[in-house]
Amino acid sequence: MTDDAVAIQKAIDRCSAEGGGLVLLSRNHVFLSGPVELKSNVELHLEATAMLKANPDEGIYRLSAFGENCGEGMLWLWANDAENISITGKGTIHGNGIAFMGAELGDSYELKPLADQTFDPRPHVLTLKNVQNLTIRDVTIKEGAYWTVHLIGCNEAVIDGINLLNNLKIRNGDGIDLDHSKNVRIANCHITSGDDCICLKNRREFEQYGSCHDIVVTNCVMSSRSCAIKIGSENMDSIYNVVFDNCIITGSNRGLGIQNRDEGTVTDVVFSNIQLDCRLWSDVWWGKAEPIYVTSYPRANGNHKDANWRFPKGQIEGRCGEVSRIYFNNITALSENGCFVGGDEPGKVKDIYFNNVRVKLVGNTGNIMMDKRPCKGEGFVKVGRDELLKMRVPLLTEHAQVEVR
């Protein structure tokens, strides 16, 4: 088994050193590769039928995708402090995800037991940190073992026309994560992911990059075992000026979600012209088929493998920030559950507007559960289906200000 990483890295290094250009992965060839660093002014172009595939040897992935936090996976294709990077073409980037999983269950794979609970060897597909002027266009990215496209502190990024096709049974298999990033446009993408399809957040490991803002997502089709479009749960800064428009969501455990669990704020977000259907999956996945979900609750204490990074340094518990000025316009949903909007105290979740939101309850009978996880205290709230059926929009609220128009 030949690893092509050295040859690919040499080509990228030379191209960047000579002022930039194109590194071509030619058609009808599978390039098996360990970790590769992408560099400034280089376009990585995959011709149709070319495939770049992750080496299944866990031992070669030694650089953490989260800096000092080694409990959340390793780097495969990555860039740090770069500019003018492009990933293009009709070829495929294959994360070889199943090779890093444990046994197959009903609607998920088990995670392999870790000898060291602070070190997770699963490789992320693309981790791009502090990249200015980034383009990802037309490629197929599939079968990630962990997060797939992670933008950290990036500015002026375009993701257009990609097929991101993860195995729906792989946990933590996020599609696109925008972390402390700004001025990002995502359009015309097809995304299937076991975890969230598109997620905005501000993780504590990268606090130096500031807030996440000025994001537009449009014309995408998504399916998720978790939440198709999510903001949170990690948010130690602010997320604002965000638009999700003209999207379709199918077969997801949750549709549109804001899950604020840290001290950061979420404001001025618009969800518009979205058609979705939600269905219940197992409790392995957060969510109970809520088509719309807006919450702010303090994060639970616990012994999670990265627990030292969940709260501000030196603290063993945290608080949650305000969620306000959130607009849902022209939303149509078929779902096994109603909507949930809640906060830990009055005034925390406010100015939430439902304008022309239509939700039809299907399938589930009897009592329904709303899922507040991850949070301190009880993770589920029980509500009667008959109670929801009486409402124009089936909606449960807790300490939240919502206006239905």
Describe these PLM feature segments:
Residues 1-405:
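Extracellular/periplasmic carbohydrate-active domains that bind, remodel
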